Structures are given as structure tokens and as C-alpha cells.
A protein has these predicted regions:
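Residues that cap or initiate secondary-structure elements
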Residues: 23-25, 69, 105-107
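Glycine-rich, aromatic-bearing surface loops/beta-hairpins
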Residues: 97-142
Length: 142
């Protein structure tokens, strides 16, 4: 008997940015709120599990802002914790925070430039969600 295999491609409807900074999450959330007029607040802890054993590896703090009627969904996630990182690869692992941004129909062109105006941020870059290894974790935030 023939077996069928379901092959689904997950499509990102969001942009993912990596941020390097020396400040804590609550302070960075406040700064992003100031820059973009968002209202990021503490949401929950995102748990990261080992793929092979299913054991809990690390917990990552999440700050979120959602406006359903305008299709705005923003999440700031602590990437680096003592137990490990959500991202994979030497470059993304040096990033302190991940910023997942879906602004519906609003253009995202100026996000990096706006964040770079902050004196509290040392680095901001665009990340490929699939290559950085966090695609599944970002979908858990929805």
C-alpha cells in the first residue's frame, strides 16, 4: 500500500530582526514603545525543548503588542539566556533579542533605521527566520 507524505511549506508573514544591546528586556521594550508608539508588555516565557529528548532546555521572556483590528503583531523575545539561545549559528547566537514584526499592510522599510537611532542599541540586523532556526518558535507566539 502506498504511503502519502504531507509536505507543507510554512510561509512567514512577519519580519524578524536581531538586536544587540547591553540593557534588560523591560528597558528595551520601553525604548521600542517610545520609538514606534507601540505598547509592548510582558506576555509570557517561551520554552525551548531539545528535539531529540524533549527535555526543557531554556526559557525566554516575551514582550508582546497586538492590535487585532489593524493586524499588528509585535513580539520582543530574549534570545540569549545562560542555558542557551533560540537561534542557531555563530552570528545569530550573539544577538541578545529577537524582534518579530508583522504590521499588516504597513510598510516595514524603516524599522532598522528607526531602531538604529536609539543610543541603547548597539546592533540591529534582519534575520532569515528559517535559517536562524527560530521559525517554529516564532509561530508559537501567535
Amino acid at each position: 500500500m502506498a504511503k502519502l507524505q504531507l509536505d507543507m511549506d510554512l510561509e512567514c508573514d512577519f519580519k524578524l530582526y536581531g538586536i544587540g544591546t547591553h540593557i534588560g528586556g523591560h528597558r528595551l521594550a520601553w525604548e521600542l514603545n517610545r520609538l514606534f508608539s507601540w505598547e509592548l508588555v510582558y506576555d509570557r516565557e517561551l520554552e525551548s525543548f531539545c528535539i531529540k529528548t524533549g527535555e526543557l532546555i531554556s526559557k525566554h521572556i516575551v514582550y508582546s503588542y497586538r492590535k487585532i483590528e489593524e493586524e499588528i503583531d509585535v513580539s520582543l523575545v530574549l534570545n540569549r539566556v545562560p542555558e542557551g539561545c533560540l537561534t542557531v549559528g555563530q552570528g545569530p547566537n550573539s544577538l541578545d533579542y529577537l524582534l518579530k514584526v508583522n504590521l499588516g499592510n504597513i510598510e516595514l522599510d524603516g524599522v532598522i533605521q528607526t531602531i538604529r537611532t536609539s543610543k541603547l542599541v548597539t546592533l540591529v540586523t534582519f534575520l532569515d527566520a528559517e535559517k536562524s532556526g527560530v521559525l517554529e518558535a516564532m509561530f508559537e507566539l501567535e
